[in-house]
């Protein structure tokens, strides 16, 4: 394997690749052609590991980025996805085909959907309609014999005594794991801590149906804090060094959105008006949605974490498990 050893911390001289230190590289996987929406991470070493594949159309982007970092088709040891949503694992089957020696690691509750994504794709089609093809493409199966599952805890061997320890972190999804690097202290948080916009340092919840659950989401934030990571690596998007403050903000934002959604529901508003009211009452918290914000940035924020999706998840949770008034 030709490694990227000796390159600057900013990464190799390739757009979309950023070196983060400790042989960790952020890869912009360019969901639907957007920049800075979905990140994958490559950990170089004796056993190179890719965390998150992005969507199916992102697979060639990932392959080319790994090639630029010296990782050839038979060099990648492991592909890990934090959960099976299409912006994180939609490309798992395609990337696995491009790197035929890599095992694919996923929480046990998501494994069957990687092996046979038909039901997942059908559900996504109902939500996104024709936009599914543009946003996510078609998820292809991952051979079942190449899938390794983790449960409450798990380990990915990175070689040389280095490892990723997985920790079950539901709340956003029932098949979600966080992963902490034993050397760098980086914690890969997937969507469990929400969506981060590096341009404005905004942090907003990601609470889609059908799996959102307030108590487990807050429990995952507490668990993440107990791991005492050095840095958070968001799939949307990038590294955040202020760990304690960011996890506290994440918990605060989730609780605020639940509170506002409850209030709108208490006023007997229909779904569309609930979404509009929650958007109105929360938007001033986010610089990306301010009156002077760049419209493209605002559109990117809404693509990453739409108000309608998050409110729908909270409404589903409220309806499924009625809360005390």
Feature roles, as predicted:
Residues 5-6, 12, 55-57, 75-87, 113-170, 174-244:
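Metallo-beta-lactamase
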Residues 2-4, 263-325:
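C-terminal regulatory/interaction regions
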Residues 90-99:
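Metal-dependent catalytic neighborhoods of phosphoester/phosphodiester hydrolases
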Residues 215, 220-279:
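Active-site/pore-lining binding-face segments in mid-to-C-terminal subdomains
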Residues 13-69, 73-75, 179-191:
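Conserved beta-strand hairpin/beta-sheet module of binuclear metal-dependent hydrolase folds
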Residues 49, 80, 104, 186-188, ...:
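Residue-level marker for buried hydrophobic side chains located in beta-strands
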